[in-house]
Design a protein with these regions (language model features):
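Cysteine-centered catalytic environments shared across enzyme families
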Residues: 1-341, 353, 357, 543, ...
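Adenosyl-5′-phosphate
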Residues: 1-4, 22, 172, 202-208, ...
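Flexible, active-site-proximal loop/turn residues at the rims of small-molecule/cofactor binding pockets
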Residues: 11, 373, 619
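Generic hydrophobic alpha-helical membrane-span motif
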Residues: 37, 147-150, 279-282, 376, ...
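Short, basic, helix/turn surface patches
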Residues: 123, 127, 346-357, 396-403, ...
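Active-site adenylate/phosphate-handling loop in enzymes that bind or generate adenylated species
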Residues: 142, 355-414, 486, 491, ...
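Short beta-alpha connecting loops at secondary-structure transitions
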Residues: 170, 296-297, 343, 387-395
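Short low-complexity, flexible loop/linker segments enriched in glycine and/or proline
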Residues: 336-340, 383-385, 564-566
């Protein structure tokens, strides 16, 4: 994995190199092996920090020109089908100097131009400069695994565009201003993350997944276009038997894993107690690898520890498994961890994911993960909530309101499976329409709570993704929306930032676009049937995995944050959440009330207090 950056515009060569060097220095963790800058005549420059994965030779460094010297590439990611593309390009007369997928990518661009994107299987964010036509292209992979930020330049009669893999790099450019977006802040308070459509600083943009940006230096205009549509697959349902679908799923996942185990450095996999990572590891085991190395961590708090199941899976599959219980010095770790994120972020699973990456990096440079399985096959409990929501609509609204009031008498629990929290969240959602209810399942501060906290709060900007699949089954709608929001802006951001903080490349076989398309096209009953989730994934791996794993419901990879906030994290959290930095915006008495309720076990405010804590720590690093 790597960091890419570039400046396109009429600046002096010296200025370009100085500014770009500063941007790259802020992203060294993404590519610690080498740093290079390529001057694009007097039109700008490309930069690259390299984490060597395939072809470790110096000749494979970037930025890289194609053989004709017309196109220059700066590339972050992996092209898993580069070998078959290379064979095709050789037949068309292309010559190669390296064994890297980067060279295959730039030669593919030289041959097919923008149409080459549709031939790629992989995760990527890359930039191409066309020397002849003075055009810049920025491209991001279909599912949004790799990040890319950009901003227009309009300063001192200079027009142009600057881009970088991470916002922490982009803001090192002196003409990029750090003006906080209140709509992005509002979205963060609601969901623990900012959206693709609205970066935390005004004037900075995130290139959406499955899109490319075309910038014309002659006109100083750019446009962003989509090159792949996930919604089309949800509309194009397959007429296929369950047995045939099971066989096809096994084939596609095997193909994906086979493409992703290629590396010239040590490779392993994350292994939790769930079926997703177990399925990936089972295919690695069948790939005839000499040895499969897997890694897990757990907490001392019993309900947050899945190590016994991961160890059972590892023993069943015969892999070399390493696991440990972690005792994180959370008050010292969290500020450093939050600073590794470009924007405010408060998913509590960031802590165990960070610790897992730290553990795995001691042994490998590349790790496969099971991320994406829940979105593809309906693994989240929120989809069961969607089903029950349909039933609840048959009850009078007065009955639903009464049930919500009664739920506040439930005793508060700080366990991982905190049913009192889930029941209260569900009953509030039962009063809403389906779209609003599905969104509310993951809300941290609902509108009423946000109003008490932030009297001058503003509505956040959110695209209504439901409209793309309005005529599909309601559970298909929910899964599509989650892939366009939760997966892109929470799960994949978390995995990218914490893995890159350790210079570890994480690959996600479930997000191979061919597998994603197939999952979207299959009947919803193959994914969720009655109270069973991931039906087809469980059936397709019944021969390979232990029964305990096949029966295991979704638990998640969360932290005991509610417990920590009442104990070892309290001092730091209270100081940060009641600091002037936050109380300038927010009502301090509302924050004090949340602390009183939480500390006295009157209400589990763990997620809301952690949201404010992470925001405050982010402000200390970036404002």
């Amino acid at each position: 994995m790597c960091a890419i950056a570039g400046i396109i515009g009429q600046l002096a060569e010296f200025q370009q190199k100085v500014h770009l060097a500063s941007i790259l220095a802020a992203m060294t963790h993404r590519g610690p092996d080498s740093t290079d800058i390529e001057i694009l005549e007097n039109h700008g420059c490309f930069g690259h920090n390299r984490l060597s994965i395939i072809d470790l030779n110096e000749r494979a460094k970037q930025p890289m020109w194609d053989y004709s010297q017309r196109f220059c590439l700066s590339f972050n990611g992996e092209i898993y089908n580069f070998q078959s593309l290379k064979k095709e390009l050789r037949q068309l007369g292309h010559q190669f100097r390296t064994q890297s997928d980067s060279e295959v990518l730039i030669e593919a661009w030289a041959e097919w131009g923008i149409a080459s994107i549709n031939r790629l299987v992989g995760m990527f964010a890359f930039a191409v400069w066309d020397r002849k036509d003075k055009q810049l292209y920025l491209v991001r992979d279909r599912m949004g695994e790799k990040p890319l930020y950009f901003s227009s330049i309009k300063q001192n009669f200079t027009n142009g565009l600057v881009f970088a893999s991470e916002l922490k790099g982009l803001i090192k450019y002196p003409f990029v201003k750090k003006s906080l977006s209140m709509t992005a802040l509002s979205h963060y308070l609601s969901f623990n993350y900012t959206s693709t459509d609205d970066a935390i600083f005004e004037g900075i943009h995130k290139l959406p997944p499955a899109a490319y940006l075309h910038y014309n230096l002659n006109t100083h205009q750019y446009c962003v276009k989509e090159y792949w549509s996930l919604a089309e697959s949800f509309h194009d349902k397959l007429a296929i038997s369950f047995d045939d679908a099971t066989a096809e799923l096994n084939y596609l996942l095997a193909e994906s894993v086979n493409g992703q185990v290629l590396a010239d450095v040590p490779l392993g996999a994350f292994l939790s107690g769930g079926i997703d990572s177990a399925a990936v590891v089972s295919h690695m085991r069948r790939n005839n690898l000499k040895q499969v190395n897997t890694y897990s961590i757990g907490f001392k708090e019993k309900t947050y520890n899945e190590l016994p199941l991961s160890q059972k899976t590892a023993q069943h599959l015969g892999v070399n498994h390493q696991a440990k219980i972690v005792f994180p010095p959370i008050s010292h770790l969290l500020p450093k961890l939050i600073s590794s994120f470009d924007e405010p972020f408060a998913d509590t699973s960031l802590i165990p994911t960070y610790l897992l990456c730290d553990f795995a990096k001691k042994h490998v440079t590349v790790s496969l993960s099971g991320d994406g399985g829940d979105e593809l096959f309906g693994g989240y409990i929120t989809y069961q909530a969607d089903r029950y929501h349909q039933f609840m609509q048959h009850l009078p609204i007065a009955t639903r309101k009464m049930l919500l009031k009664l739920s506040h008498y439930l005793p508060t629990s700080f366990n991982k499976i905190s049913w009192d929290y889930k029941i209260k969240q569900f009953l509030r959602g039962s009063l809403l329409d389906f779209k609003s209810a599905h969104t509310s399942w993951r809300e941290i501060f609902n509108p009423d709570q946000k109003k008490l906290l932030w009297p001058e709060w503003v509505e956040h900007n959110s695209k209504d993704w439901f409209n793309d699949v309005a005529d599909c089954h309601y559970l298909d709608q929910a899964m599509y929306v989650d892939m366009k929001t939760w997966l892109v802006d929470d799960i994949l951001v978390k995995v990218d930032r914490v893995s890159m903080a350790h210079s570890l490349e994480v690959r996600t076989p479930f997000l191979d676009h061919r597998l994603v398309q197939f999952a979207a096209r299959m009947p919803i009953s193959y994914k969720i049937h009655n109270r069973q989730s991931k039906c087809i994934l469980r059936a397709s791996h019944a021969r390979y995995l232990p029964p305990a794993v096949l029966r295991q419901p979704k638990k998640g990879f969360n932290s005991p944050i509610s417990y920590w906030l009442s104990n070892e994290l309290f001092e730091l959290a209270y100081e940060v959440t009641t600091s002037q930095q936050l109380t300038t915006w927010f009502n301090k008495s509302a924050i004090e009330k949340m602390w009183y309720e939480h500390r006295n076990s009157l209400y589990d405010n763990g997620h809301r207090l952690f949201n404010l804590l992470c925001l405050g720590l982010w402000c200390q690093s970036y404002l």
